[in-house]
């Protein structure tokens, strides 16, 4: 599924072990956890602020949670995603949301990656937890595990304060995800939940929304279709 590491990871030298990822036919049979499902219970050791900490789904009760999976530490697309989400963690927190990144690596691998400088392909200091799923149970419960390779695909789940999945995406390995889009969708669900109106395509905070109903929706359609 992927080739062996070209060079061994050395903890004392900031050298990145190169990992080559390829796609699998197993992706065709993946069934990521969809909207309206209850988030599975999870618990594991994460790297938080440069140390090990056990975290679980219970830590996020009453909060919005962005839970995203990535294939492997010390790869190429993955650090760009994790750094992008980590660098904007406070934007999520301002909306009452937390972000957790998870892969099937060990917490020791996560720590080595955090301790590797970004200029060498590492993560550097992180403002979000990196959860270790070494036994692959978490990825499997969320439906993003490729059992042939033991990798998790790029699944992302937006979970509301009641523990209900509201939004799911799952990318094939070569393409990373958008922080801007995740924030947009989070704000849209929060607006809809609060106001009871629905959000049309490409909705942003300054965009009109729709009052659901045959008659009431015409206010929106008349406004945007002049």
Curated annotation (Swiss-Prot):
Catalytic residues (positions): 78
Recorded superkingdom: Eukaryota
Oligomeric and partner information: Homodimer; disulfide-linked, upon oxidation.
Pfam name, any one: AhpC-TSA
Coiled coil (UniProt feature): none
GO cellular component entries: cytosol; mitochondrion
General function of this protein: Thiol-specific peroxidase that catalyzes the reduction of hydrogen peroxide and organic hydroperoxides to water and alcohols, respectively. Plays a role in cell protection against oxidative stress by detoxifying peroxides and as sensor of hydrogen peroxide-mediated signaling events.
Record-given protein name: Probable peroxiredoxin prdx-3
GO MF: thioredoxin peroxidase activity
């Amino acid at each position: 599924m992927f080739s062996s590491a070209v060079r061994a990871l050395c903890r004392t030298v900031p050298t990145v072990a190169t990992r080559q990822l390829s796609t699998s036919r197993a992706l065709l049979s993946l069934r990521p956890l969809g909207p309206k499902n209850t988030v599975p219970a999870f618990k594991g050791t994460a790297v938080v602020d440069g140390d090990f900490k056990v975290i679980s789904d219970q830590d996020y009760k009453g909060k919005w949670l962005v839970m995203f999976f990535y294939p492997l530490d010390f790869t190429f697309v993955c650090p760009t995603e994790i750094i992008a989400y980590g660098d904007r963690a406070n934007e999520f927190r301002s909306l009452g949301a937390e972000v957790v990144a998870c892969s099937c690596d060990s917490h020791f691998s996560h720590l080595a990656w955090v301790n590797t400088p970004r200029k060498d392909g590492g993560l550097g200091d992180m403002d979000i937890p990196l959860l270790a799923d070494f036994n692959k149970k978490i990825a499997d419960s969320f439906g993003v595990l490729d059992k042939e390779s033991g990798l998790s695909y790029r699944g992302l789940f937006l979970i509301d304060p009641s523990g209900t999945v509201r939004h799911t995406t799952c990318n094939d390995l070569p393409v990373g995800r958008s922080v801007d889009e995740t924030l947009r969708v989070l704000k849209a669900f929060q607006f809809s939940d609060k106001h009871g109106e629905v959000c049309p395509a490409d909705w942003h905070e300054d965009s009109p929304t729709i009052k659901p109903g045959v008659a009431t929706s015409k206010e929106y359609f008349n406004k945007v279709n002049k």
